[in-house]
Amino acid sequence: MTEKINLLNLSETELQGFIASQGQPLYRATQLLQWIHQRGVTDFSLMTDLSKPFRQQLSEASFVRVPELALERVSADGTHKWLFRLADNNKIETVFIPDRKRGTLCVSSQVGCALNCSFCATGKEGFNRNLTLAEIIGQVWLAARLLKSPYKITNVVMMGMGEPLLNYEAVVAAMHLMMHDHAYGLSKYRVTLSTSGVIPAMRRLREESPVSLAVSLHAPNDALRNVLIPLNKKYSLDQLIPLCRDYYSRGSKRCVTFEYVMIEGMNDRLIDAKQLIRLLADVPCKINLIPFNSFQGTAYRCSTESAISVFQKCLMDAGFNTRVRRTRGDDIAGACGQLAGQFHDRTGRHQRWVQKQGHDFNRPIPAIDH
């Protein structure tokens, strides 16, 4: 007997192939996209503009399954953080950040993270596996159903757990669905992928997906970036910066956004700002300064407000569009760099971290009753 297929795990092209294999016209794929993503229907029997024989055919050959809600927390500032349970019982985190007329969903791409950035809680938890397409787009599907009016998803950022470009195929397919007119209909300007700088995948992304690009920079030189982002030892700044400079075509109004976490005494001095100015001198870009969000066991501390202000002014005086990202959801460990999830670490990285610190830093998350 042929194994049933989770339709959420199919790209648009694969869904069309599945429809053709069922002897149906291709417009059925569009109908399914609308039922599943726009209307949130996963029960084929309720898809009333499909014929009864086709609905029966679908139920025999396929299903629609999303991750399930394990826990939810809501911050004092309105930020929502969800812990989603996957079929293998690993759990990932997804965050929704409301802001006036805008609602940004921060989506995870891996169970844990394959990288080990020193300032990020996810990296200290280790790594289990890549998420499937169904598990990535399923976060968007679930969030859209869990949010109550007036909250609405207007933007998606691939900035949750994991390095998106180390899960390229599933992430790009999911972002395509986010922008698809018959799914979530988001503009390419409202879907952003953040990467630590996986150079080959960045080159491929530039050719294959129109989404906005953000780069986790966090340091103005290789020596410091090697400490903060070990991936830099493989893909150094002399490879990363030229690619960012030429990522969008000349004359385009679009530019790369650089993310720069502000860590006291490490990368927040005036000399660091001046070095950053020289590094990015000919790169069309925006710069987001991110106050460091602490997590248990880290020795890092956030820069002072005055240090951040001086740093920002130095960059702005040099002509850089620079903003300080307002910290959201830190009271529920939902801010940038704080996502951890709950999963089995296949790398042993988390256990080494625990042994080094002397105790376990897994944080229990209280549930909200539904």
UniProtKB/Swiss-Prot annotation:
S-adenosyl-L-methionine binds at G162, E163, S194, S216, L217, H218, N293. Its main location: cytoplasm. Its EC number is 2.1.1.192. InterPro entries: Aldolase_TIM, Methyltransferase_A, RlmN_N, RNA_MTrfase_RlmN, rRNA_lsu_MTrfase_RlmN/Cfr, rSAM. The active site is at E93 (proton acceptor), C336 (s-methylcysteine intermediate). Coiled coil: none annotated. This is Dual-specificity RNA methyltransferase RlmN. It comes from Coxiella burnetii (strain CbuK_Q154) (Coxiella burnetii (strain Q154)). The gene is rlmN.
